[in-house]
Amino acid sequence: MDKKTQALVEQYAKSLVEIAIEKDSLAELQSETEALLSVFEETNLADFLSSLVVSRDEKVKLVRLLQESSSVYMNNFLEVILQNEREAFLKAILEGVQKDFVIATNQHDIVVTTAVALTDEQKERILALVAEKFGVKAGKLVENIDESILGGFVINVNNKVIDTSIRRQLQEFKMNLK
C-alpha cells in the first residue's frame, strides 16, 4: 500500500474510533468491526470490493447488506465509505480501526509461551503481572506451548517482553563462561 493510500486508511480509521469514543460506544463498534473483519476473512469480500470487473452497483448492494446488521454509527460510516467510493479499502480501514481501538482502550493481546499448558490460576497471575509491569489491560491471552524453552515463560505484550525461560538463562550462562 502506498503512502497516500495508507494515510487515507488511517484517517478513516481514526475518524471512526473518535466517533466511538465521543458517543461512548467503543465496545459496540469494536465488536462490529471484529464481526465485519471475520466476514472478510471467511469470504473473498476484499477481492470483490476491490475488483475492477465488478460493477459499482454490485459493490454498493453488498455494502448495503452489511449495513442491515450494523449500528447507526457503523451504518453512517459505511455510507461515507460508499459516498466517497472507498469500498476497495474497507478491509484495510477496518483493520486500522481495530489497531486504533487497541490504543484507545489500552487492551493489548498477551502472548504467553510456556513449556507446558498454564492452569487458570497461572493465567490470572500472568494477567496481574502484565497489568503491574506494563500498565495495560489484557485483550486476549494467547497461549503458546514451546517445549524448547525448557521451563519458565516468555510474555509478549505490545512489543515488550518478559523472558524467564530456562533456555534464555542457559544461553546467558553459556555467554558468561566464554
Curated annotation (Swiss-Prot):
Keywords: ATP synthesis, Cell membrane, CF(1), Hydrogen ion transport, Ion transport, Membrane, Transport. GO terms for cellular component: plasma membrane; proton-transporting ATP synthase complex. It is a peripheral membrane protein. GO terms for molecular function: proton-transporting ATP synthase activity, rotational mechanism. Signal peptide: none annotated. F-type ATPases have 2 components, F(1) - the catalytic core - and F(0) - the membrane proton channel. F(1) has five subunits: alpha(3), beta(3), gamma(1), delta(1), epsilon(1). F(0) has three main subunits: a(1), b(2) and c(10-14). The alpha and beta chains form an alternating ring which encloses part of the gamma chain. F(1) is attached to F(0) by a central stalk formed by the gamma and epsilon chains, while a peripheral stalk is formed by the delta and b chains. F(1)F(0) ATP synthase produces ATP from ADP in the presence of a proton or sodium gradient. F-type ATPases consist of two structural domains, F(1) containing the extramembraneous catalytic core and F(0) containing the membrane proton channel, linked together by a central stalk and a peripheral stalk. During catalysis, ATP synthesis in the catalytic domain of F(1) is coupled via a rotary mechanism of the central stalk subunits to proton translocation. This is ATP synthase subunit delta. It comes from Streptococcus equinus.
